[in-house]
Amino acid sequence: MSSHASHSAAGAPPQPVALSESTRARFAREVAKYPAEQKQSAVMACLSILQQEQGHVSAEGELAVAEYLGMAPMAVHEVTTFYNMYNQHPVGRFKINVCTNLPCTLRGGGQALERLCQRLGVAVGGTTADGLFTLQPGECMGACADAPVLLVNDRNMCSFMSDDKLDQLIDGLRNAEGQA
């Protein structure tokens, strides 16, 4: 049973998270970009906002988005699970997605992923004990000519990731957090 199908300790199904007025205002700005009868088109933007504010999209968060947009909860869950940019569980301060599609794999993507596993002391999909890093495989990031590539926090693309560049990246992120 996945965490999205989990129930509370009392056995009750998950309840939607309470959305703050600020969150509702941000949702409303996204919904306003679409015709009223197509407000569900804002689902990805609303999920991104929720993740920015809460760090991940929980089952309860999915329910809140579904209620806000008038969607079936399963339709929101399908979006959350289809796209790897949505974290369904808490992740580290720095989420590192290493491209594992064929062009990156042929140019060292697999070795880069292994190097990061060793350097961080985690398995693929794991989070470091200090909560600083989560390491995940990723789908094509659209930069095949720059392989191997990785993405930090779904926003910062890093290209041509040699062992030296991987070490510099980890050291730089640790230094940025004061954990050198």
Identify the meaning behind each predicted range.
Residues 1-180:
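Signature of N-terminal electron-transfer/Fe-S-associated modules in redox systems
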